[in-house]
Amino acid sequence: MASSSSSLLILAVACFVSLISPAISQQACKSQNLNSAGPFDSCEDLPVLNSYLHYTYNSSNSSLSVAFVATPSQANGGWVAWAINPTGTKMAGSQAFLAYRSGGGAAPVVKTYNISSYSSLVEGKLAFDFWNLRAESLSGGRIAIFTTVKVPAGADSVNQVWQIGGNVTNGRPGVHPFGPDNLGSHRVLSFTEDAAPGSAPSPGSAPAPGTSGSTTPGTAAGGPGNAGSLTRNVNFGVNLGILVLLGSIFIF
């Protein structure tokens, strides 16, 4: 009788685990409310800095609409930034959108920066066209940057860089921290179904500067490109455990 009760208990636990496993593997970005923004086709939990990217690729005009969500490193006066690097994989050469709160309950200010070197952070035009640029304050102290950028025709991925920083003085952002996460906040963003997750775009010449509009080893381990593999591994491990438990019931 005791053996039968133990078997039933094990079976009940196994069924419970199988039911909750999809919730365990679900991406956090899918539950985010982006206020007035429409739905995006895809989203990624970026691997560092508690940051998220929502995006939609439009092949008809080679554009990428994005919403970048992050929390500044300081509750008051901090900034967040998302960039595309047409010529490399890290910060130098990045074409960045940077947002910060100006105070008084107003919407965050968002500016563009052409980052020519690690020691230079000067506001200026970007090397590609963009439009519909804006920023919003979200719950939990987060800031969201929205924009649509022009990407090269036929491209299936871009090098994205993101960052969070501290104080902003007279509209000029301060230096960001130099911890491992801050230095590792760059990944390849593959935005078409045919893109190979591990292949980084080859650095080349930046496109000719466009007009700004009005007012996201290849992908490293643990990065956005491996999210699907992680989910599959979690579910496979759970299902294998269930099979082992069920087998033990019938054997004993």
Swiss-Prot record:
It is a lipid-anchor; GPI-anchor. One of its GO terms (cellular component) is side of membrane. Heme binds at residues 91, 176. Its cofactor is heme. The keyword Iron applies. Induction: Induced between 4 and 8 hours after treatment with auxin and remains high for at least 24 hours. Residues 227-252 form a propeptide. Binds 1 heme group non-covalently. It is found in: Cell membrane. Residues 195-219 have a biased composition (Low complexity). Residues 193-224 are annotated as: Disordered. Residues 49-165 form the DOMON domain. Residues 1-25 form the signal peptide. Pfam families: DUF568. Keywords: Auxin signaling pathway, Cell membrane, Electron transport, Glycoprotein, GPI-anchor, Heme, Iron, Lipoprotein, Membrane, Metal-binding, Signal, Transport. CDD domains: DOMON_CIL1_like (cd09629). One of its GO terms (biological process) is auxin-activated signaling pathway. GO terms for molecular function: metal ion binding. DOMON domain could bind one heme b. One-heme-containing cytochrome. PANTHER family: AUXIN-INDUCED IN ROOT CULTURES PROTEIN 12 (PTHR23130:SF157), CYTOCHROME B561 AND DOMON DOMAIN-CONTAINING PROTEIN (PTHR23130). This is Auxin-induced in root cultures protein 12. It comes from Arabidopsis thaliana. The gene is AIR12.
